[in-house]
Regions:
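A surface-exposed partner-binding patch
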Residues: 1-112, 182, 187-188, 194-220
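Long, low-complexity, intrinsically disordered segments enriched in glycines and aromatic residues
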Residues: 56-177
Length: 220
């Protein structure tokens, strides 16, 4: 089965290069996972399969904010290991409907797809999960590649922010301070309106923030 193009990833790599941000990328394995192949009991999102056909792992913009995509190659399957570990842990019930594929460097923040809400082509929406104390999620993209695209625009705004040199990512935290960027994602907005993520947004601030995304969309 063929893999799909990833224009969002291409833009993210271009932005990192243009802004002089760190990029650490490992080559793909000889036998990358196919779209919809079972990984930790979950069909692999086709955009993630496309990513792993190009790279075995990526750490992008760690000197600004940081996006890590877990390692999968001929020697390591971090997707399998991380998802199995999280589902077996004390927060396992929360992670059961999610498929974690990355996170932020050195923080208990994960990026995960929500397989139950995949679109007709099988592409899964993405949430950011905060696991400090009681876990909660923020819906951030309709697909994995849309996350890459949105994150690339976020990095441009972050680096241009007047407080970036002094405060780093705290000057414009992702995704809390950029609901206007997520509001451009029409399918994400539709899923939020339909209540698809309500069970995952266990935090009152998360629910209020999702309302900010909807308000930002109404102003487009």
């Amino acid at each position: 089965m063929g893999t799909s193009a990833l224009p969002g990833l291409d833009r993210l790599l271009e932005v990192c290069g243009r802004l002089g941000l760190q990029q650490s990328v490992l080559p793909p394995g000889k036998h990358p996972p196919e779209p919809f192949a079972p990984v930790a009991g979950t069909p692999l999102d086709p955009a993630l399969a496309s990513f792993y056909s190009r790279m075995g792992k990526a750490i992008l913009a760690a000197d600004a904010d940081g996006l890590v995509i877990f390692q999968v190659d001929d020697g390591i399957n971090q997707l399998e290991a991380e998802n199995n570990a999280l589902r077996a842990g004390w927060q396992g019930d929360y992670f059961a409907p999610l498929f974690v594929f990355g996170g932020r460097p050195l923080l208990a923040h994960y990026f995960a797809t929500v397989p139950n809400w995949s679109d007709p082509s099988g592409f899964q929406p993405v949430v950011r999960v905060d696991t400090y104390e009681r876990p909660y999620a923020l819906p951030i993209a309709s697909t994995v590649d849309r996350l890459f695209d949105t994150y690339s625009h976020y990095l441009e705004e972050l680096v241009a922010h007047e407080d970036f040199n002094a405060d780093g990512a705290a000057a414009l935290s992702f995704p809390w301070k950029v609901p206007h960027l997520l509001a451009r994602d029409e399918r994400l907005v539709q899923l939020i309106r339909e209540g698809s993520f309500d069970a995952l947004m266990t935090d009152a601030d998360a629910r209020a923030w999702s309302g900010e995304v909807l308000n930002a969309h109404s102003r487009l």
